[in-house]
A protein has these predicted regions:
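Active-site His/Glu-centered metal-binding helix of metallohydrolases
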Residues: 159, 168-177, 228, 232
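Catalytic Zn2+-binding segment of zinc metalloproteases
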Residues: 172-191, 200
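Short helix/loop segments within enzyme catalytic domains
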Residues: 7, 99, 106-112, 118-124, ...
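Hydrophobic or amphipathic, alpha-helical segments that drive membrane association/targeting
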Residues: 1-142, 215-218, 254-255, 274-286, ...
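Short acidic/histidine-centered micro-motifs embedded in hydrophobic/aromatic stretches
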Residues: 188-192, 246-253, 304-307, 319
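Short pre-active-site segment immediately N-terminal to the catalytic Zn-binding motif
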Residues: 106, 151-166
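Residue-level signature of catalytic and energy-coupling elements of molecular machines
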Residues: 115, 151, 229, 296
């Protein structure tokens, strides 16, 4: 059992949380020890915090290529700026202030601690975090000047504390990677495309933005941006299995408790092998995901495994201390 620092009993050993720094007393007979503040597992292993992390050190090559293709579309920046100038961030802030629970140091403090861990590790100013009731296992980041992160309640209920940290870190990764302008536009376009907007003041702007080339390019980039932020999540959790298990739950839903994790990883490797070697598999994977905002969870796992197995992740984690705190 973990208690607040001021309640530490000298009769029991204490462990300082590697993630948030909270000092916890641990009863020898209490079973798995977790931090009383962030609820993450206690361990004496180190946790690296990056003082000067450059986004280019972890941005996925596919993200970089898709963003270049998006920016090359004539008029894209003008159209997006018009849309965001009209909607601004007020709509996002009003919606979630009115319909969701704002996370603070005293409201859902373990979630606040997880946000603080992710921001401290990546070197990002803390955005506002909200929890909204929703049966979908999902989260998203919106806004530009003052981004907000929203976690759906079902996600918190379904995932472990470490997996929730991974999701929070993924969303913070969007901020660190400077995705928020295009990401907010992509999500807004996706929403407007599903809504009766023809009679709204945004009609002319929406018509401009919903050209096939712009929509396709935005969705293509948004899918690949997720791969970069999965890497950011790994830089925070510092455990590839946490990322893998999170994706397994996104794939299997409530059935995930009956899924063998090792076989799921083997499935991810098999998918990557076929994608790399078989043109037809690659064609169908690209066609099926072309209308989606997120890549397949199995593909995301295979990409994280590849990043780890190529040694790129380890190289970043073992960089000289001059680049990390």
């Amino acid at each position: 059992m973990a208690d607040n620092e001021e309640l530490i009993n000298n009769n029991f050993p204490s462990i300082r949380c590697r993630y948030c720094g909270q000092r916890n007393q641990v009863r020898p007979d209490a079973g798995e020890a977790r931090c009383g503040r962030c609820r993450l597992r206690l361990s004496d292993a180190p946790h690296k915090k990056f003082a000067h992390l450059d986004k280019e050190e972890y941005i996925h090559p596919a993200d970089r290529r898709a963003l270049a293709a998006l920016r090359a579309i004539p008029g894209i920046d003008t159209a997006l700026k018009k849309l965001l100038a009209v909607t601004g961030e007020s709509a996002i802030r009003v919606i979630f202030t009115a319909s969701a629970v704002k996370v603070t140091p005293t409201q859902c403090p373990d979630l606040y601690a997880k946000l603080q861990i992710a921001c401290t590790t990546l070197g990002v100013d803390m955005p506002e975090l909200f929890v909204q009731q929703n049966p979908v296992v999902n989260a998203f980041t919106g806004g530009v000047e003052r981004p907000v992160i929203v976690l759906y309640s079902q996600l918190i209920e379904r995932l472990s504390d470490e997996e929730v940290l991974a999701v929070v870190a993924h969303e913070v990764g969007h901020i660190h990677a400077e995705h928020v302008l295009y990401l907010t536009a992509a999500r807004l376009i996706e929403f407007l495309a599903k809504t009766a907007v023809l009679a709204s003041p945004l009609a002319s702007i929406v018509k401009d933005l919903l050209t096939m080339s712009m929509r396709a390019a935005l969705l293509a980039w948004a899918r690949r941006a997720e791969l970069s932020c999965d890497r950011a999540a790994l830089l925070v959790t510092q455990d590839a299995n946490v990322i893998g298990r999170t994706m397994m739950k996104l794939s299997g839903g409530t059935f995930a408790s009956r899924v063998d994790y090792d076989q799921f990883l083997a499935q991810a490797r098999d998918f990557q092998k076929n994608y790399d070697e078989k043109a037809l598999d690659r064609f169908w994977a690209d066609v099926i995901t072309s209308g989606l905002s997120h890549p397949f969870p199995v593909w995301r796992v295979s990409e994280i495994l590849r990043w780890v197995e190529t040694g790129e992740y380890r190289a970043l984690m073992t960089a000289p201390e001059s680049a990390a705190a």
